[in-house]
């Protein structure tokens, strides 16, 4: 399992805060952040993202996540009608990892599409989940050419949620002796349990500099926070699906494409300040990427391996 480390927990002291913020905000190359390629397989080709809804979610909440997944490869018939910066443009940063890993090969680029949606409102495995139960839920989705995403509702507890992680990504082997490995993700709705850890900057942080929380672009602190964490974990899954791709640090708690840029969403970011963002003039919601169906999302900066810097959309 690979942890999505709390953004503010990564700043272990005021000294570390100031050094990290200066390098990230100025976009200067920082060798400490360089993600090493460990020669393992990366996801490629057409991959379905299957959503496994565990607990009660409103249809409007499910639409936020499904629209985000659709937005990853969403293109408009004409470039003039495609709002920029877009979610699809944000995702293209991950392609740079593939080109560096296989410079002489013509491997199929990764293309993510929204797959099946499985709804388990009755919480068939109970409302207190362990990692093993998360893996069991993830196995309900397709196990070939798929990423299975388990999304837990606000009243479901998961080991470590709100204490050491906001979500995880990992891999498991499918059923049968010759079952192939498949990738999975878990993200929880932190709205009532730990919004200060997992829904910043839409909620005041538990630790660190305090500033007024931003307005969530889809008017749902929990779900907009889930989008941030899901986006980070999807980037990590694409570039380090089986624990031997691009990462830095310990294999079971690595820095990856998004977690290498903690707390950065726009230019000028520093601890307690997400960066200079776009603001919806009607709702007041802060965002940095346009998505499908008129959506607006706030997405984390991604580490750009070609520049050794954190790349932001705005």
From Swiss-Prot:
Residues 1-21 form the signal peptide. One of its GO terms (cellular component) is plant-type cell wall. Keywords: Apoplast, Secreted, Signal. It is found in: Secreted; Secreted, Extracellular space; Secreted, Extracellular space, Apoplast. Expressed in root tips, vascular tissue of roots, shoot apex, rosette leaves and embryos. Required for cell expansion in leaves. May mediate brassinosteroid (BR)-induced leaf growth. May play a role in the control of BR responses in roots. May be involved in signaling processes that coordinate BR responses with environmental or developmental signals. It comes from the Eukaryota. Disruption phenotype: Reduced leaf size, root length and biomass production due to diminished expansion of epidermis and parenchyma cells. The lineage of its organism: Eukaryota, Viridiplantae, Streptophyta, Embryophyta, Tracheophyta. Pfam families: Phi_1 (PF04674). Induction: By the synthetic auxin naphthaleneacetic acid (NAA) and 24-epibrassinolide. Down-regulated by kinetin. This is Protein EXORDIUM. Coiled coil: none annotated. Its main location: secreted. InterPro entries: EXORDIUM-like (IPR006766). Over-expression of EXO promotes growth in both shoots and roots.
